[in-house]
UniProtKB/Swiss-Prot annotation:
UniProt KW keywords: Blood coagulation cascade activating toxin, Calcium, Disulfide bond, Glycoprotein, Hemostasis impairing toxin, Metal-binding, Secreted, Toxin
Quaternary structure and partners: Heterotrimer; disulfide-linked. The heterotrimer consists of 1 heavy chain (a metalloproteinase) and 2 light chains: LC1 and LC2.
Listed GO MF terms: metal ion binding; toxin activity
Localization in the cell: Secreted
Designated name of the protein: Snaclec factor X-activator 1 light chain 1
Miscellaneous remark of the record: Calcium is required for ligand binding.
Tissue-specific expression: Expressed by the venom gland.
Lineage: Eukaryota, Metazoa, Chordata, Craniata, Vertebrata
Reported modifications of this chain: N-glycosylated.
Boundaries of every C-type lectin domain copy: 11-13
Signal peptide: none
One of the record's GO cellular component terms: extracellular region
Family assignment from sequence similarity: Belongs to the snaclec family.
Length: 13
């Protein structure tokens, strides 16, 4: 689920 303004900003891994 890529619901972030980018392609990593949402990733908290």
């Amino acid at each position: 689920d890529f619901d972030c303004p980018x392609d990593w900003v949402x990733y908290d891994q």
